[in-house]
């Protein structure tokens, strides 16, 4: 599927909007057509808005709940761009369905409790449920692999511009193994995210302040690829 990279508006009256919603790309660049994989890799808002206009926010909100999101998910178009507040716990849990062939697995902290003699007192098993087919899960993982192959997470693969040596911690990383993931950056560069998946492991990183008035002045410094992704990379290398 290819989508034109043009600013897309959802008109007032649609999905309960009181005024038109016309989000821009973060770099304010447009033109050409993009595959979904390329658009996700580059965090292209116009394509995400196009999809939201076709699907509507209600199915997206319902899917989020099926994926273990317990925070309130407002049924509004802007959720397509990640405007709701979620915990790392919720996001990592949601990603388990992509890595487990469509099977959501609730993250748990304690697996078993033993006494001082090693006698098992309690054994805990995570709650699981099928959310979508293995084929859908595979497709999503393939799309997310594009993020580290050619998109906002490509600095996991190679060094790029030399200026980043002074900006990104412990750079470069030079990973060659399969990695699927997604960076995230909130309004005004106050929060940075990276959720990364390798076979048998999903790890989520959030950076930011409880007070959103504390933020980076420019996206180059405040984006998830600069703030959260390096922490993920250092953790994986260790």
Summary of predicted features, one role per range:
Residues 48, 79-82, 128, 220:
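Conserved short-loop catalytic and cofactor-binding motifs
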Residues 50-51, 81, 181-182:
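Thr-Gly-centered strand-to-loop micro-motif
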Residues 18-33, 70-78, 154-171:
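Short, charge-rich amphipathic segments
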Residues 1, 77-79, 108-111:
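Extracytoplasmic/periplasmic beta-strand context in beta-sandwich domains
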Residues 10, 14-25, 56-93:
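Mid-domain, small-residue-enriched loop/turn segments at the edges of structured enzyme/sensor domains
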Residues 1-60, 104, 114-146:
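Conserved catalytic neighborhood of penicillin-recognizing serine enzymes
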Residues 38, 42, 87-238:
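A penicillin-recognizing enzyme superfamily signal
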Residues 53, 65, 99:
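Short polybasic/polar patches that bind polyanions
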């Amino acid at each position: 599927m290819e989508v034109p990279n043009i600013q897309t508006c959802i008109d007032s009256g649609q999905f309960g909007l009181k005024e038109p919603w016309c989000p821009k790309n973060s770099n304010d660049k447009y033109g050409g057509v993009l595959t979904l994989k390329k658009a996700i890799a580059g965090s292209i808002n116009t394509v995400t808005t196009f999809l939201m206009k076709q699907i509507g926010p209600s199915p997206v909100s319902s899917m989020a709940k099926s994926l273990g999101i317990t925070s309130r998910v407002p049924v509004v178009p802007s959720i397509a761009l990640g405007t709701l507040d979620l915990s790392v716990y919720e996001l990592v849990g949601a990603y388990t369905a992509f890595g487990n062939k469509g099977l959501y697995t609730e993250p748990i902290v304690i697996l078993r409790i033993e006494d001082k003699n090693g006698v098992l007192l309690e054994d805990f098993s995570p709650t699981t449920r099928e959310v979508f087919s293995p084929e859908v899960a595979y497709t999503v993982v393939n799309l997310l692999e594009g993020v580290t192959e050619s998109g906002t997470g490509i600095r996991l693969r190679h060094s790029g511009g030399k200026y980043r040596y002074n900006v990104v911690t412990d750079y470069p990383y030079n990973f060659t193994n399969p990695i699927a993931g997604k960076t995230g950056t909130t309004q005004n560069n106050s929060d940075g995210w990276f959720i990364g998946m390798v076979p048998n492991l999903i790890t989520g990183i959030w950076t930011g302040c409880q007070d959103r008035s504390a933020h980076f002045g420019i996206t180059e410094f405040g984006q998830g690829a600069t703030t959260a992704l390096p922490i993920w990379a250092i953790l994986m290398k260790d």
